[in-house]
């Protein structure tokens, strides 16, 4: 798995050839590619891995997505091996989705409970 974190200017700084090569290699190997905040738009879009996929990012960066991408406002979007999320307020849901994929749903549920996620 490769995870591209968000924030600015960090997301823009990830849009370099070395990161692009790494992302494309992970995609070719069928590995999970995860990204949050502005990074899906600024760092993943140039790699081509978002072409034809359903994706999300921090509001205002959507115009950087490829025309073939299906834009979503969901907190976390999973399309095949690519997982994207919107930003700081969705980071917990993003993290739990990664746990579901790396470990299993039961472990993610235990973490959710331990964090008092559903506590009133």
Where is each model-derived feature located?
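Active-site-adjacent pocket-lining segments in enzyme domains
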Residues: 1-120
């Amino acid at each position: 798995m490769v995870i591209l974190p968000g924030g600015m200017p960090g997301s823009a700084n990830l849009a370099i050839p070395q990161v692009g090569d790494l992302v494309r290699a992970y995609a070719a190997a069928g590995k999970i590619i995860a990204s949050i905040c502005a990074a899906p738009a600024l760092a993943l879009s140039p790699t081509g891995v978002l072409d034809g996929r359903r994706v999300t990012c921090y509001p205002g960066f959507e115009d950087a997505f490829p025309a073939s991408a299906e834009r979503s406002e969901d907190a976390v979007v999973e399309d095949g091996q690519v997982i994207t999320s919107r930003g700081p307020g969705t980071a917990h849901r993003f993290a739990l989705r990664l746990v579901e994929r790396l470990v299993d749903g039961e472990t993610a549920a235990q973490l959710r409970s331990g964090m008092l996620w559903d506590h009133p």
